[in-house]
Amino acid sequence: MEGEGRGRWALGLLRTFDAGEFAGWEKVGSGGFGQVYKVRHVHWKTWLAIKCSPSLHVDDRERMELLEEAKKMEMAKFRYILPVYGICQEPVGLVMEYMETGSLEKLLASEPLPWDLRFRIVHETAVGMNFLHCMSPPLLHLDLKPANILLDAHYHVKISDFGLAKCNGMSHSHDLSMDGLFGTIAYLPPERIREKSRLFDTKHDVYSFAIVIWGVLTQKKPFADEKNILHIMMKVVKGHRPELPPICRPRPRACASLIGLMQRCWHADPQVRPTFQEITSETEDLCEKPDEEVKDLAHEPGEKSSLESKSEARPESSRLKRASAPPFDNDCSLSELLSQLDSGISQTLEGPEELSRSSSECKLPSSSSGKRLSGVSSVDSAFSSRGSLSLSFEREASTGDLGPTDIQKKKLVDAIISGDTSRLMKILQPQDVDLVLDSSASLLHLAVEAGQEECVKWLLLNNANPNLTNRKGSTPLHMAVERKGRGIVELLLARKTSVNAKDEDQWTALHFAAQNGDEASTRLLLEKNASVNEVDFEGRTPMHVACQHGQENIVRTLLRRGVDVGLQGKDAWLPLHYAAWQGHLPIVKLLAKQPGVSVNAQTLDGRTPLHLAAQRGHYRVARILIDLCSDVNICSLQAQTPLHVAAETGHTSTARLLLHRGAGKEALTSEGYTALHLAAQNGHLATVKLLIEEKADVMARGPLNQTALHLAAARGHSEVVEELVSADLIDLSDEQGLSALHLAAQGRHSQTVETLLKHGAHINLQSLKFQGGQSSAATLLRRSKT
């Protein structure tokens, strides 16, 4: 059977396969090219891909086309070309190596990619195309686009789909058909659209490569908003290229050079476009030095392309400042960068900032033994001996002990802290991704804490677990939200991240967003169904926290989500209590007007929002609460009214407000104190004056039958004593028979004693017992007696 197949197909070194050799058929892709199945070879014990013809019944012409594609791929055996093994006889299909990551098109649409990976993909694609063009005769791909650039498990490029590939100079009039062109038309050069009979040449692929660069830079599809193929063709012929949106921070400096290369590659004149041999030299430099000055690659071509540009760049999104920050001073669009390159404007670029903390902070133990794990150089070109040596060395060094060692751990930590994504891409191994550091944190925790967004992207691409916790119970999401790292938050939420995970204080990520007033992160979390009712160890929901920290924007966001503002926290505190306590007037107004909210709601100890505002002296909050019908005479469990609280804490303006709004000035606490007693006892002169002006009873007796004068004298508040003293009060005794003078002398308050003596306080036997002391009060008493 196999011999018959070989003769029939004339495959040369390729082999034929029977359907029985494969198991577990799973469709992984379909389109105009047919269907692609993931299969497992029964004997080889490995996964392969089979691209089957779109037709149910394959005729001789389709068989020949499939055979031709297989032969081209066989001829083009190379590191960045997808390996082909042969032909499956039934169903008829091309048997190839299975690429776990899938196509570049799929990857670009899935999540933001690290810049180092983007540069590497561009470079490896260029190296693969250079190999094809260096064949004799040159092999033209003619359908280079992200859908035909596959990526292995380590995100290395494998160029595929040689169905349209031809040798240099060949042409057929039927090559440009309208069937299946929608995904390809944007990658066709203008000369091919204008002249169907034009001979193919290498510059066709160079133009397509430019559009691939555009897609890698923007992670968008070219002309995505244009639904009419003819309109796209007309635009391209007229010199228009895909629109150039802003490239937001962070971005390496080499981005400008890559844009210049892209501009030359999509030039309207094919002769101006560089060859892939020239391109690979430039992309290799970009990969090696993405954050350093790179030679000017954007020299002015003979004729400028007509480009659609935008004059304004998007404002930079609020995000955590990265420790390694190589971006330009200002955000600018691709078109703005191009205009700067075209006009020859030199840009002064700041160097990357360095992270303040050093890798030594991680306290990694020294390694007694270890192995150097295998890695793949990201910049080795097809003809670079340096790249080959690097690869050879790392592979040989990979044999050794199993598992990551301390020295490998230190390399990973150093790469992440320094923001060296290129280094991280080379040394990170699958078994290292969820490595636990000495602080019980993962590499992902470290990257988030250091603000290294590019490293976070690479770790997530390698399936780092976003739900691991450190010693404090924090996940990377907790840390990212706490540090307001919006970009990192978006990356984490794009994964299967637990949005309601709690740290050691029972805080969720939404608690941190509420505390920081981070509306962007709050919205992102709510879109991922973050719970608004999770409570921390003090019973606070995110709404409580937002009110406590005065984050009105978060309060409004949560209210729009229907959050229950009547949900009680610890000790029955409502969000309104927290807002009143902290004096956040706009939030108090907002909450007090919500349906079902009572401005007289009491905490476990009986305090209302008005009590709390009075205690902290938040006059404007107290006024709005009173305007909203808060009871000025409501009592706490200790029978304190808001006036008692204001007097005790000395907030005179608030006390005046309460008095003018009907607060009872003679109300007694559970211990028998009036507002005047509390103001005098605590030495609040202005409040005492206010209460006296408001006709508060200075003769009123409190605990131990003491007047306000007794209380002020006992505490040594001489100025208050001066205000309260009168002939009727000065020698009054409490239930222990002590006058104000006795109490002042007992407390050794000499200035108060002097004040009372000055006003004629009587010295009796009870007072004389203090004369034996050495205090200044005793001295005053002795002098007065004599």
UniProtKB/Swiss-Prot annotation:
List, in alphabetical order, the Gene Ontology terms for molecular function in this entry: ATP binding; protein serine kinase activity; protein serine/threonine kinase activity
Q: State where the record puts the cross-link Glycyl lysine isopeptide (Lys-Gly) (interchain with G-Cter in ubiquitin).
A: K51, K145
Write out the catalytic residues in the record: D143 (proton acceptor)
Give start and end of each Protein kinase domain.
22-286
Output compositional bias ranges, type Low complexity.
357-378
Localization recorded for this chain is:
Cytoplasm; Membrane
The name of this protein is: Receptor-interacting serine/threonine-protein kinase 4
The protein's organism comes out as Mus musculus (Mouse)
